[in-house]
């Protein structure tokens, strides 16, 4: 019985090839659209939900108006960290963040501009539970002469992730020692485009953090 139904269905499809093609194309487009919508919704619902301490984290932005346009900026003014900790004792930990410029990095005769990076406090890695391939989470980003790389950037510069202790020249003026290598950051994290992190102490040393 089932075989007869299948034969009849095929005959009808062959008799109405144009109509059949339209239906098949419509079905395919509908299925692809449904899958894409599902993936988009999943990405939105999982965005920044990958951290173990998600329910304890709060990202603070600074609202400003320029030329009549109001925006929210996520760079942190220098005094904010100490002031917030003093004003709100319930804050267990805090890290400031300032986006870096596109530094020129040099190792031997290799030079590259890796793109996005950020200056952060020492507590940053632990707060967001970013997984380390190498390095001591309790001690990295403590010195102004350190840098933490992602796995991808470490491989691009050194060809390996076993690079703790190796030195990178920044903009031909600063020598920084690699203190840790992070696993590549997932695409559903706000830090997905960051390929390195620098200590806030380094930012203070070079004088970028005078905003108040």
Question: What does each model-identified segment do?
Answer:
Residues 16-45:
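Short, strongly hydrophobic transmembrane alpha-helices
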Residues 37-103, 212:
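Membrane-proximal extracellular/periplasmic loop immediately following the first transmembrane helix
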Residues 5-14:
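A short amphipathic helical element positioned immediately N-terminal to and/or at the very start
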Residues 11-12, 20, 40, 76, ...:
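Membrane-interface anchoring determinants
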Residues 62-73, 96-123, 133-147, 171-173, ...:
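Short acidic/polar micro-motifs at solvent-exposed secondary-structure junctions
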Residues 121-134, 147-212:
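Mid-to-C-terminal secondary-structure elements
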């Amino acid at each position: 019985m089932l075989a007869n139904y299948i034969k009849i269905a095929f005959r009808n499809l062959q008799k109405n090839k144009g109509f059949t093609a339209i239906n098949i194309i419509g079905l395919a487009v509908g299925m692809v659209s449904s899958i894409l919508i599902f993936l988009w919704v999943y990405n939105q619902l999982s965005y920044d939900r990958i951290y173990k301490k998600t329910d304890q984290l709060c990202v603070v932005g600074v609202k400003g108006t320029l030329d009549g346009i109001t925006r929210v900026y996520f760079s942190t003014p220098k005094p904010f960290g100490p002031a917030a900790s003093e004003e709100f004792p319930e804050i267990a930990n805090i890290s400031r963040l300032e986006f870096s410029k596109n530094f020129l990095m040099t190792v031997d005769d290799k030079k590259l501009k890796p793109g996005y990076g950020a200056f952060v406090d020492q507590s940053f890695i632990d707060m967001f539970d970013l997984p380390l391939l190498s390095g001591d989470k309790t001690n990295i980003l403590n010195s102004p002469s350190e840098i933490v790389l992602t796995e991808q950037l470490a491989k691009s510069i050194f060809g390996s992730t076993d690079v703790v202790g190796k030195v990178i020249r920044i903009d031909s003026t600063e020598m920084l020692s690699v203190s840790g290598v992070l696993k590549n950051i997932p695409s559903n994290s706000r830090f997905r485009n960051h390929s390195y992190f620098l200590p806030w102490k380094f930012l203070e040393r070079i004088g970028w953090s005078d905003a108040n």
